[in-house]
């Protein structure tokens, strides 16, 4: 079985897509179409930053999708079509939208606009600097919930995603998430990583 899984938010970084754009006209076309759809030079933001702007949800989501779609187009340029060769496509959170676009369920333009709208809605729900997320590695749901309860201290700190039997994501107030990262080892959790969201 061949499966293609697309990344979710938190996988963005300044410099993403630069080598693809330099090496492939198909990748440049993807970045150009997304820029046009958003009336923004997102490709430049992806290439040069600043990181603080790229990490904003309204920018990060379409940027991650554009980068993944550029990879898909480079594969297609080489004769490897995901919709034909893959048995399935999937994505982690926002990657689900990329998966749909990669097999033609959504157009690239519509996906970029949808993710911009989704990103703005998510950003507006929690003002910048108020919320945060962390991934807990080596944590089951029970340990993650106990850590969230200990870290909350009157603030919000909740289990957000149960990714697999050994990885859970917490979200909540920034201070509570910072406490969770500090307390993780005391709760028998191998590692806690604050996510760039």
Spans of features found by a protein language model:
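A short small-residue
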Residues: 47-54, 98-99, 194-196
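Helix-rich "cap/lid" substructures immediately adjacent to catalytic or cofactor-binding pockets
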Residues: 2-90, 170
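Alpha/beta catalytic cores of group-transfer enzymes, especially the acyltransferase/condensing modules
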Residues: 9-12, 36-38, 103-197
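Patatin-like phospholipase
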Residues: 17, 28, 41, 65, ...
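Residues that mark the start of a beta-strand
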Residues: 1-2, 132
